Amino acid sequence: IFTDREKANLHLQAGAKKVIISAPGKNVDATIVYGINDHLLSAEHNIISNASCTTNCLAPMVKPLHEQLGLESGYMTTIHAYTNDQQLTDAYHPDVYRARSATHSMIPTKTGAAAAIAEVIPELKGRLDGMAVRVPTINVSLVDLTFNAGRETSIQEVNQIMKKAAETELQDVLSYCDKPLVSVDYNHIPFSSNFDALQTKVNGSLVKVMAWYDNEWGFCNRMLDNTITLLDANNHDTPIISAALSSAKGQQKNL
């Protein structure tokens, strides 16, 4: 409801100090994917967007691969659990696809998650596009990314790039898995992106990679992370609140 600047500003007018939109936002001060561009948050930002759960999964995949291999162009498909934007039985919806029963069909539909990558990694503007297939599962989704790299590579190199990223600079938002897991195994996992090393395919410079994500719980964790970061950026008598949120964050990740 409050996903554009005009409507989100109503919260500020009512006395709120900051607004974090839990969805892609329009004309916001910044779109932040925690772990990727949260260092840009400042006290001047009053209305920010946490992007989408899918963008939060895709960005930690794309960043290290682009830095090491160069991403020339790519297409993403998210195999996405159904959400409350869909109908449980066939009924009216502005999107004819989403008017169909979420529990009875696989439903192709649109997503802006791939294009939104440019808002957090500007050099990728125009290089990525994508679509979604909504499936009749309650939770946990999968990003399937195919891209043309700037040079030839191998399965081993791609997996090593992702493993290193998950162990170092992206350790808070990216996990690496080389076990034969399925969607239910990632339920209630707090990471934005869980890279599935067993699904990596390479043909010269053509690369396919996949990552799982709990599209509810993982995204909620990033909302909390960005809230803490925004509080720290403002530094207006918030150390007690920030410390309490940090403690809550630690408890959540241990669940």
Regions found by a protein language model. Give the residues of each.
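A short N-terminal beta->alpha junction/helix N-cap motif
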Residues: 49, 104-105, 211
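Generic alpha-helical structural context detector
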Residues: 63, 119, 163, 225-228
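NAD(P)-dependent Rossmann-like dehydrogenase/reductase catalytic/cofactor-binding core
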Residues: 190-255
